[in-house]
């Protein structure tokens, strides 16, 4: 992302957003580190943007970013295997406590496909439709995350621009969550957590 793109992003952000998240899910973040430092400069026009700034690295990279002090909020992609949530949150927690910043998952989700609970980030995974796989994964994520007071929320992947009908959704093995059984789990979680530190 060059200076022209950053300025355009700045113009849109000032008008439209309360939080700006730079995402690329990249492992080599030297360019983004420079971008974050530029964003934090008080003498630049960018300071017209008064919202929060975050960066969303790919999963497993949270403790490899050396410039979290340049952003307001630490974020990450939450595509962890169903049986590894606790250990990954333990690892992420060390970074969150070190930098003393809020944290959220800027992207998290799982397909409704057999086997996707173990490799939720692999959208190319072939397998049969299994709606319960998605439900199990979300239950595991929410159960592990609700015990972490430093975790402030999730951007769930995915909400399609065109919502499917219930009959379409129940045949859909993608990350889509609308009109699927997992929607009930998500609703219950947020109803229960309303007013707590997670919200």
Task: Say what each PLM segment does.
Residues 33-37, 140, 185:
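Alpha-helical elements of Rossmann-like donor-binding domains used by nucleotide-donor carbohydrate transfer enzymes
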Residues 45, 77-84, 124-133, 172-176:
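The substrate-binding groove and active-site-proximal loops of carbohydrate-active enzymes
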Residues 54, 58-122, 142-151, 177:
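Glycoside hydrolase catalytic-domain groove-lining segments
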Residues 66, 115, 120-123, 132-137, ...:
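Aromatic-rich peripheral "rim/lid" segments of glycoside hydrolase catalytic domains that contact
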